[in-house]
Amino acid sequence: MDRLLVLVRHGQSDWNLKNLFTGWKDPDLTEKGIGEAQAAGRGLKAKGLAFDIAFTSALTRAQHTLKLILGELGTPDVPTTREQALNERDYGDLSGLNKDDARQKWGEEQVHVWRRSYDISPPGGESLKDTVARVLPYYCQSILPAVLDGKKTIVAAHGNSLRALVMVLDGLTPETIPSMELETGVPLIYRLRANSTVESKEVLKLG
């Protein structure tokens, strides 16, 4: 049985381009982001991959990325679940702020701690640990059972919500996961064993 799970971070958004903390705010993709999502779809198609089921967040940039990928695959009607549990980390009071302006206001070191520590949250927001605590139960209850049932599964989400999944799949620690970068629009192709551990992982090279 092929237990396929593909993870993809959304393409570049308007606020990525403007260097803003985005979190639960809802900007759409830039032209570059649209191109990244389409390239991801073409790359998956070139590998002969198709999907039985899809999951994405409640935010436009992830939903748009998924729609473009499925369009390139010629399968726009794949059953799709849109779930708030897969949303990006909530940056609280940082949301909508330019990252350089935030560094000027709070200091470079403090902003770095908020962005790259595991369990320290910005004012009014979530830590990465908080994000993991809402993403992983949803993965275990809804996504993983589909994969283990042999349904070819794609998840289009966000840098931090996907970090939570990669942390479990790759066996990373709370110390190492915050510094791991996920490129926009680049699929991670996993195949799982029946016990849910990873049999193989491929980062799909595009272009």
Curated annotation (Swiss-Prot):
Reaction(s) catalysed by this chain, per the record, are:
(2R)-2-phosphoglycerate = (2R)-3-phosphoglycerate
Q: In which pathway does it act?
A: Carbohydrate degradation; glycolysis; pyruvate from D-glyceraldehyde 3-phosphate: step 3/5
Annotated disulfide bonds: none
Signal sequence annotation: none
Q: Where does substrate bind?
A: 9-16, 22-23, 61, 88-91, 99, 115-116, 159-160
Q: Which Pfam families match?
A: His_Phos_1
Q: Which UniProt keywords apply?
A: Gluconeogenesis, Glycolysis, Isomerase
**Record EC number:** 5.4.2.11
Record site: Transition state stabilizer:
H158
Q: Which domain of life is it from?
A: Bacteria
User: Record's Gene3D superfamilies?
Assistant: Phosphoglycerate mutase-like
What does UniProt list as catalytic? H10, E88
GO BP annotations, alphabetical order: gluconeogenesis; glycolytic process
A GO molecular function held by the record:
phosphoglycerate mutase activity
Recorded hits in InterPro entries, A to Z, give:
His_Pase_superF_clade-1, His_PPase_superfam, PG/BPGM_mutase_AS, Phosphogly_mut1
Function recorded in the entry: Catalyzes the interconversion of 2-phosphoglycerate and 3-phosphoglycerate.
Task: Give the family this protein belongs to, as stated in its UniProt record.
Answer: Belongs to the phosphoglycerate mutase family. BPG-dependent PGAM subfamily.
Record-linked NCBIfam families: pgm_1, PRK01295.1
Task: Give the quaternary structure.
Answer: Homodimer.
- Write the protein's name: 2,3-bisphosphoglycerate-dependent phosphoglycerate mutase
